[in-house]
């Protein structure tokens, strides 16, 4: 597909067919050696897309209360896509990170603060120098509570931007979570395995105001 095509989301009818077999990944997280798939009792899951998932995953695995992180694909149509397929723009997915966290230590609201303050949510189908629908900003809530918090935080961040003199509209997609597909193992904890690797994320200098 051309770069122009990759700036527009593919329709479900035109998406690649994919496959039934999940991507094989390591059993344990390369940084903290926690399970890559299990969710311990009392913990919750969050899904965020902020551009290239290498830097995004590192941002979240460093936080106290985060049990595990995983790079993957969300918000699209093609089952079990490959990285190459996602980069073609023909699967509909965003590069996303799955975060398993302990809400007794770090809240979803705190995760949203990290989300908003560490990327540019106004860039549409790109993030920085990374162009394509897979780099879009997105939040994929799993519960009505997460959905309400995501929308409320978006409104607060838009107001904070305006107060700072930035009147660009937020383009972040907020949509109920569809299946999350793990990326290939080489992409998991990529910046731990490749500490001098590419990290293209950065905020716009605006802070998320606290929930009233």
Curated annotation (Swiss-Prot):
<dbReference type="GO" id="GO:0005737">
    <property type="term" value="C:cytoplasm"/>
</dbReference>
<dbReference type="InterPro" id="IPR002569">
    <property type="entry name" value="Met_Sox_Rdtase_MsrA_dom"/>
</dbReference>
<protein>
    <recommendedName>
        <fullName>Peptide methionine sulfoxide reductase MsrA</fullName>
        <ecNumber>1.8.4.11</ecNumber>
    </recommendedName>
</protein>
<dbReference type="GO" id="GO:0008113">
    <property type="term" value="F:peptide-methionine (S)-S-oxide reductase activity"/>
</dbReference>
<feature type="active site">
    <location>
        <position position="52"/>
    </location>
</feature>
<dbReference type="Pfam" id="PF01625">
    <property type="entry name" value="PMSR"/>
</dbReference>
<dbReference type="InterPro" id="IPR036509">
    <property type="entry name" value="Met_Sox_Rdtase_MsrA_sf"/>
</dbReference>
<dbReference type="GO" id="GO:0036456">
    <property type="term" value="F:L-methionine-(S)-S-oxide reductase activity"/>
</dbReference>
<comment type="function">
    <text>Has an important function as a repair enzyme for proteins that have been inactivated by oxidation. Catalyzes the reversible oxidation-reduction of methionine sulfoxide in proteins to methionine.</text>
</comment>
<comment type="similarity">
    <text>Belongs to the MsrA Met sulfoxide reductase family.</text>
</comment>
<dbReference type="GO" id="GO:0036211">
    <property type="term" value="P:protein modification process"/>
</dbReference>
<keyword id="KW-0560">Oxidoreductase</keyword>
<dbReference type="GO" id="GO:0034599">
    <property type="term" value="P:cellular response to oxidative stress"/>
</dbReference>
<dbReference type="InterPro" id="IPR050162">
    <property type="entry name" value="MsrA_MetSO_reductase"/>
</dbReference>
């Amino acid at each position: 597909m051309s770069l122009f095509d990759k700036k527009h989301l593919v329709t479900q009818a035109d998406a690649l067919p994919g496959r039934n077999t999940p991507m094989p990944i390591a059993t344990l997280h390369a940084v903290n050696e926690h399970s890559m798939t299990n969710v311990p009792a009392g913990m919750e899951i969050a899904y965020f897309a902020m551009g290239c998932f290498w830097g995004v995953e590192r941002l979240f695995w460093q936080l106290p209360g985060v049990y595990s992180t995983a790079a993957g694909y969300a918000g699209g149509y093609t089952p079990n896509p490959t990285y190459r397929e996602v980069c073609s723009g023909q699967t509909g997915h965003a590069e996303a990170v799955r975060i398993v966290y302990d809400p007794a230590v770090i809240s979803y609201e705190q995760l949203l603060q990290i989300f908003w303050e560490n990327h540019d949510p106004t860039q549409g189908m790109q993030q920085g120098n990374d162009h394509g629908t897979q780099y879009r900003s997105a939040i994929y809530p799993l519960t009505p509570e997460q959905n309400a918090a995501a929308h409320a935080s978006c409104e607060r961040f838009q107001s904070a931007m305006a107060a700072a003199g930035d009147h660009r509209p937020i383009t972040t997609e907020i949509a109920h979570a569809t299946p999350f597909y793990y990326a290939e193992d080489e992409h998991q904890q990529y910046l731990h395995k490749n500490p001098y690797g590419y990290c293209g994320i950065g905020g716009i200098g605006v802070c998320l105001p606290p929930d009233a």
